[in-house]
Amino acid sequence: MHVNNEIGSIQPIQEISKHLKTLKDKVYLHVDAVQSYAKINFRPSRYNIDFMSVSGHKVHGPKGIGFIYVKENNRIKPILTGGGQEIGIRSGTENTPGIYGLGEAIRIINEDLDGKIEKIKNLRDLLQKEIMENIEDIKINSPEDGVCHILNVTFYGIKGEVLLHYLEQKGVYVSTGSACSSKKKGSHVLNAIGLSPQEIEGAIRFSLSDLNTEEEIKEAVKIVKESVSDLRMIMRRR
């Protein structure tokens, strides 16, 4: 996993790749780039990546479609055989609208990609600054050198799940962790970085896009501040 989808930490793929080269046996490097593609500008060939997976919905493309990068001369044994579609890797009727939509989304997002990444980073910095200046008793869980679009924050004294639904009613959409493991108890990621059960319980994740604006960030923080204040007041009455 290139980028952790809960807190945004970036894994040292280049260093991992260099280490694999020193091993006696050939080890293939597959990178889950779902959270890093178009959020970090990199070329898989320069990182010596053998295989890389990307999901369309993370780049404003259709859901249910993605692509895999395969380094030249590498081979994948197909799971489905028969018709020979998708250059013999995955037989079956091709999702033509999804493929076209994904291709178009990738074309659009790669137009001035560096500019888009810089904009998202500035929005993330603004979000963090506004939260820290306007809301008391919080903890930033994302690393300073993390990916540009993820900010994980703990709000002490309330439950993240309750805050999530409270914000949802007001048009602000956040998450309490990975969509892949939202039904599990607690977050193993937040636990691994040393957060207490109470800090884990009060954590939510903000995810940003180049389509967001500074005005939206400031309005969202205003709503979060009001919501956190309301929920803390309710908790104190119990």
State each model region's role.
Residues 1-238:
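Pyridoxal 5′-phosphate
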